[in-house]
Amino acid sequence: MDNCPPASTFLTDSLELELQTEWCNPPCFSCDFDNRGGGKHFSGESYLSSGALKRVILNLDPLPTNFEEDTVEIFGIEWVTETALVNSSRVLFHLFRQQLYNLETLLQASCDFGKISTLHCKAHNIRQLCVTFLHYVKVFIFRSLQVRNAESHVPVHPYETLEAQLPSVLVDELHGLLLYIGHLSELPTTNTGAFVNQNQTKLYPPSWHLLHLHLDIHWLVLEILHMLGEKLKQVVYSHQFMNLAGDNLTNVSLFEEHCENLLCDLINLSLNRYDKKVRPSEALMSHHCPCPCIKELWVLLIHLLNHRSKWSLSESFWNWLNKLLKTLLEKSNDQRRSVLIVQPRDPLGFSWWIITHVASFYQFDRHGTPDEMRQMESNWNFVEELLKKSISVQDGILEEQLRMYLHCCLTLCDFWEPNIAIVTILWEYYSKNLNSSFSISWLPLKGLTYIIKSPLSMLEMVKTCCCDKQDHDLYKSSSSYTIFLCILAKVVKKAMKNNGPHPWKQVKGRIYSKFHQKRMEELTEVGLQNFFSLFLLLAAVAEVEDVASHVLRLLDFLKPTFKTSPLIWKGQMAFLLMYTQKNLDIGVLAEKFSNAFREKAKEFLVSKNDEMGQRQTLWTLLSIYMDSVQEVFETSRCLHPSHEKLLNDGFSMLLRACQESELRTVLNFLQAVLARIRSLHQQLRQELQREHGDLSVQSSLSTKERHLAAVASALWRHFFSFLKSQRMSQIVPLSQLADAAADFTLLAMDLPSTAPSDLQPQPVTSMIQLFGWDDIIWPQVVARYLSHFLQNSMLCEALSHSGCVSFQALTVRSWIRCILQMYVKNLHVPDDSFIDINPEQAVEKDYMEQLTELTRLLFKLSEVKNIFSKSQVELPIPDDPKKALIRFFEAVGITYGNLQTVSDKSAMVTKSLEYLGEILKYIKPYLGKKVSSAGLQLTYTMMGTLVKSWALIFATSKAQKLLFRIIDCLLLPHTVLQQEKELPAPMLTAIQKSLPLYLQGMCIVCCQSQNTNAYLNQLLGNVIEQYIGRFLPASAHVLGLGQHPVLLALKNSASVPPMSLLKKCIVHVIRKSYFEFKGSLLPPRLASILAFILQLVKETNTDVSEIELLLPGVLKCLLLVSEPQVKRLATENLQCMVRACQVGSGGEPAAQLTSVFRQFIEDYGMRYDYQIYSILEAVAALDQQVVIHLVPTLTQSLKNSERKWGLGRNSAQREAYSKLLSQLGQVGQDEIQRLENDHIESML
């Protein structure tokens, strides 16, 4: 025992039982144990865990396995076990005090890390010696002390004399020991922390050992005195000491004196902690025990004192503690008893704090094990007095203190049996202060705003108050009044559970009696809030119907104001919600509240243009009603006729009076109720299927379904007519309009009979027609509505089997319209606002997402999937609705082209036109005065794609009219035909980008048309005529013509016949419109058109017949125009055309080309002979044969010219002609010779 242990070693109870004959370390106070898991409260070698307390209480051997040998070593000396205490008691206690002194001297040594190990071992050994001695005293009293008869006159042995004196000696020595060690509070400050060495062994300073040894001494003295009394069954008088009253000191008086001093010490320790470290807000989280050993000492005292009070006239623990605490609460020093307790700064607060924490120790049993189910002994009498003092302070009660007091009181209500008197005392205070906010200026009250927010939040507050476990942060989150409500709830619930309704009647009488008309009129807004909180809580824990009816009677005394009306409505609606949660009939409340709602809705409608203050107040009340009714529907297990009362014509009036933001709230309410009705209907259908054979259950479920239908009919009556009237309006938020319409459609599917007569006999189809297929509805509404509709597989399946065979085609039509009109909503915004914005960004993000979702769902329709499957066009990714529409148009065109039979083609044309509907109406908004670049671009691109992809369809007589209208509307509107008017730049840009699509499509139609259509050919010519010139570059650069839409149409055309037709038409337009020389007036923009022709000839396989049409104009330009650029371009054209003719005729001179030149010579040879020769020289350089074929014509033209002028031989002309002939080889030389011969003959 003298050696220092490496760590805290002890034997558990089970090991102690197994090793019955082995020495066990005696129990002692120790906080050196591992509690990282949080499960252990005391050390294994403590008085509780080791079973030492139990042995004392049950009067068992304190240490059955110790001190069994004949001798025992105490303080390093061997003693005879059975006689040592009798023979040498004073010596032993003297040695004990010496050891104490040795330990105290160790405190003077410095505790650095180098010395701590030695100091720890020394102090530990001293403590073990002292504790072992006191346990030896206990064991000696139990085993060896003999009870002698004091009246016996028989001679006794000297030992027996000493033995008889031992109890008095022990009282003397124990009293002297207590005087020597003094009070716990007088010990030097102790650091309860430990040093940890490299072996992870905890080493404690001497001060720690001294504190714990003092604790051991204080407790073991009590044990020894208790055992002495139990053993002797009589009072033991001291021989040396008297108590403070002058009486002889006895074991009983010493026990009581020491017990009182020890409790005073513990209170002082707690006081020191309370005054320095405890804030009111942290009172219950700040414990009063500096270490577990102090806590153990409290528990030991509780058990020991309560045990003694049961079997003797001694006082219980609570009486001891109450007696001491009362001295703290005395107002004058003269009235206080002479106890050694420091006066605290807050006696009331400290008393609440210490009582609450000490009460929690009652949960520990004799082994130190917590047992929450254990019945705890209460101390209500003292707490009642404490509570009265707490709320009757004359100087005024501080809220921050009151919260702490009541929080402690609430905790005690958890521990102890219910006490109605507590509620009565508190109610007397709060009934007088209902108008107080119970707030703390420096602490924001979280709960107040939370409570006032809504009826549901008021109920949540009540539920919080009724919870069995309260938040530790209650001080900061709730007022003292709220904590009072928690106390009220807990006490009433517990009392009614134990004693039936009688406690409730007591409480009800006390509370109801405080409210009458005058008191109700005195309540402020805060007072009303507290009033509702109180009665809602009473309704929650007791008779809700009785409380609610009483509250309504009390409210009739009030005349609501603008400030109090919202609160009154919230409170009333909170009772309605409580009825619903408790599954009670809400009929009476629903009738009363819905009538009030109707009246307020009527006022709201009338006050539409009145001042905003009154309107805002009315809207607040109406919002409270809607929020509460929504909550009623969402929390009701099933609907009853009384639910229909909540939906009256007040909503019809309200809807007409609402502005946009207010409408959002009403429609949110509507959607929530619709969703709840459908959910309940689905549950009923499932239950009907499960209970197919049980007629009684089926009858009950059918009744519930009728109730559902009645509520649904009310919604149709009071909401739908307004929604229907707002289909084309922008007052109602479009997304909510679509959502509400979709919900009504699903309701029509579930309960078709509830729909109004104008939607019958097929309400679902009628609804979709109104909100999904009608072309006058905003596309934002349609897209969102159809997305809801297509997501519901049951609805789609029902439509498929309802005879509505066109529902897929009509849905596709609406989808096309939604895409084409995606920019319509932005037409009111100036177009320059979107200069730097991507077109997709010009569309609302929500709408683009909705279009994407609609596209995804649409591509799942069987009809659409079938089209893509037949066309073998891959289904596009729906992330880009515009690209998806283009792919759809292409897929339809390819599918039609793959059809073989006439009937299939005719049906496909009909279906395709059904997809388009009045498509020109969809794009009409973009073609008005308000310009949208993105909208025009979208329109022209989509329609161009349609014209090209559906060219074969437009070739049919059924579809050709639509094609004509498209061309007239988009490419040949009146503004285009009026040459003096410039087209808007965005429109011109859109046409330029999409014109190739139209031209190619029109050419295909012309080639494939079932009947020769002169009008269509004329349209094609008109389009080319209008846009060739509009898109010619300002300067005649051939490089700039590469992107001319007319040329692009030729480049990108995959089929030869349409390209040939298009080129032929282009050539005719150029010849007609740009090569008409009227007198001296030259055709406009000759250079640009020549550049265009040059590009045309270079990039296409120009036919000789087309060159035959263009070449005269080019020759005229060379002949008649002197502008250098025109001459250069005309020369290049001439060269290209000659080369093209060479290629086309296989190297032989083309007859058509020769014919063109011959006619040119005949027309202009008389006047422009020199220019003609110059032109032909250029031609001869490319193709001599062409010019050789023209020699006879040229010679004849020369002769005719000479004859006309009548001047004989024209030498200059002949010389120019000879120059040309000299370039023609032998044929030219022969002709020169022939002309010379003719001249000679004429001379002769």
Curated annotation (Swiss-Prot):
Single GO MF annotation: single-stranded DNA binding
InterPro entries linked: MMS22-like, MMS22L_C, MMS22L_N
Pfam families named among the record's database cross-references: MMS22L_C, MMS22L_N
Gene Ontology biological process: chromatin organization; double-strand break repair via homologous recombination; replication fork processing
Location (main, coarse): nucleus
GO cellular component, one term: nuclear replication fork
Subcellular location: Nucleus; Chromosome
Top-level taxon: Eukaryota
Post-translational modification: Degraded by the ubiquitin-proteasome system upon replication stress.
UniProt keywords, alphabetically: Chromatin regulator, Chromosome, DNA damage, DNA repair, DNA-binding, Nucleus
PANTHER family: PROTEIN MMS22-LIKE
Oligomer and partners: Component of the MMS22L-TONSL complex, a complex at least composed of MMS22L and TONSL/NFKBIL2. Interacts with RAD51; interaction is direct.
Function: Component of the MMS22L-TONSL complex, a complex that promotes homologous recombination-mediated repair of double-strand breaks (DSBs) at stalled or collapsed replication forks. The MMS22L-TONSL complex is required to maintain genome integrity during DNA replication. It mediates the assembly of RAD51 filaments on single-stranded DNA (ssDNA): the MMS22L-TONSL complex is recruited to DSBs following histone replacement by histone chaperones and eviction of the replication protein A complex (RPA/RP-A) from DSBs.
Family, per entry: Belongs to the MMS22 family. MMS22L subfamily.
The protein's name in its UniProt record: Protein MMS22-like
Organism placement in taxonomy: Eukaryota, Metazoa, Chordata, Craniata, Vertebrata
